[in-house]
């Protein structure tokens, strides 16, 4: 995920 706030996977990447 690019890290979009809408994308929950962004939380794990930016985390």
From Swiss-Prot:
Its main location: secreted. It comes from Tityus stigmurus. GO terms for biological process: proteolysis. The keyword Repeat does not apply. It is found in: Secreted. Ca(2+) binds at residue 7. This is Venom metalloproteinase. Expressed by the venom gland. Its EC number is 3.4.24.-. Binds 1 zinc ion per subunit. GO terms for molecular function: metal ion binding; metallopeptidase activity; toxin activity. GO terms for cellular component: extracellular region. Keywords: Hydrolase, Metal-binding, Metalloprotease, Protease, Secreted, Toxin, Zinc. It is an enzyme of class 3 (hydrolase).
């Amino acid at each position: 995920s690019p890290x979009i706030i809408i994308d929950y996977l962004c939380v794990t990447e930016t985390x």
